[in-house]
Amino acid sequence: MELTAGVTTELSGAEITLRCLQEEGVEIMFGYPGGAVLPLYDEIFKQEKVKHILVRHEQAAVHAADAYARSTEKVGVVLVTSGPGVTNAVTGIATAYMDSIPVVIISGQVPTHAIGQDAFQEVDAVGVTRPCVKHNFLVKDVKDLAVTMKKAFYLAATGRPGPVLVDIPKDVQTAKTNFFYPQSVSMRSYNPVVKGHSGQIRKALQLLLEAKRPMVYTGGGVVLGNAAAELLQLVHTLGFPCTNTLMGLGGYPATDPQFVGMLGMHGTYEANMAMQTCDVLLAIGARFDDRVIGNPKHFFQEERKIIHVDIDPSSISKRVRVDVPIVGDVREVLQEMSRQLAAGKERPDPVALKTWWDQIGAWRGRDCLKYDRNSKIIKPQSVVEKLYELTKDMDMYVTSDVGQHQMWAAQFYKFNKPRRWINSGGLGTMGVGLPYALGVQLAHPHATVACVTGEASIQMCIQELSTAKQYRLPVKI
């Protein structure tokens, strides 16, 4: 590891932790106190740069930090105590992990001399969270604390983002050492590829230009990779149909005529038919989830060439065989695609494209999302449509719980911007909606935040209404 110059001062481990957060530009953290983190809480109250939000349950702390990260491009931060504090947080951590959200979780731990002795409120935080974090650390020496915190933020935010846990024993929090915060870290075992291979990009473009029935399939990676503008430019240049997954909504504007709707088991007929019958498929920041393609064996009954762009090499050819893999940051790859396309004169066959769009138009004609608009009973679909009409010109964010209401929100609210739709797609965690709304509202105090929820989901984290009241957060439910 290489370190660059920082600042040197003798501080306690708790002071170092707070200084690290300040160095990373953290403004808000979510947490719940306990015995193993009291030194940290003592330091929180001595400073004003990092605001602490007291939730009513550790699960909600992680959900709120998760939503804060989703809506801001920043890393969410959580502070929990040892034992039940960590175990309560696991559902939130797993939710963030499945959706690739950058969150740093700081957990207290029993003193180092008591680890492994079944001490009061002792839990193996590293072992418990190993399956649902991008990485985790147990800090046994205060001298390692600052660089570990730097690593945690670096790992959480780069490559394929994800939650990182830092477990800090109580005696490490009280021990003192010189504070040196590195401005950067370099780890030989971790080196995410950013730029896609130019040869693979050329090969992909050739396939796309020769396609008769092309399709662009995008997921949450476009949103997380801040590649919405680059995607729109490429799709408009090519003239291809584009679809988003549940996690990708907003990555391509829903009101654009080339958008064929959401994909998957709750998606539109035209999006699914185009996906199943295309001859060249460009997948960007998506992972061919079972809710999108179903059984991979059935998906391959039709012949097609697949191009897959993703920052995570382990996602490529994981569920389906890929013809042209491109590992890299989706924004960088899309920019290079547009550059190469602009440099050449070749364009897709307009006659073949018209025939393809005519077929898609016929599928659209089925109006698969229609419902009885004359019913005397208020339909949920109508409620979501009305919400969109009332708020489409506002600075608006929509959070959702998990269930049928989530799908109605995804189907009938037209998301034209990224990071405006906050929901649990991978783990499908009921109860996220309200704490998500709190996290978004704190991140965007002047925006309007609405939580679409169901009668069961709202009860799973309903105690967070108290948090909303305490901090005067005007979320709409």
Model-derived features: where do they sit?
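Phosphate/pyrophosphate-binding active-site segments
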Residues: 1-8, 143, 206, 303, ...
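Glycine-rich phosphate/diphosphate-binding loops that line cofactor/substrate pockets in enzymes
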Residues: 15-26, 67-73, 97, 155-160, ...
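A short, small-residue-rich loop immediately preceding and capping a beta-strand
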Residues: 21, 27-30, 50-53, 71-110, ...
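Thiamine diphosphate
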Residues: 106, 114-121, 272, 277, ...
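Conserved thiamine diphosphate
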Residues: 120-159, 277-278, 324-325, 333, ...
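Conformationally flexible catalytic loops at phosphate/diphosphate-handling active centers
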Residues: 155-210, 368-369
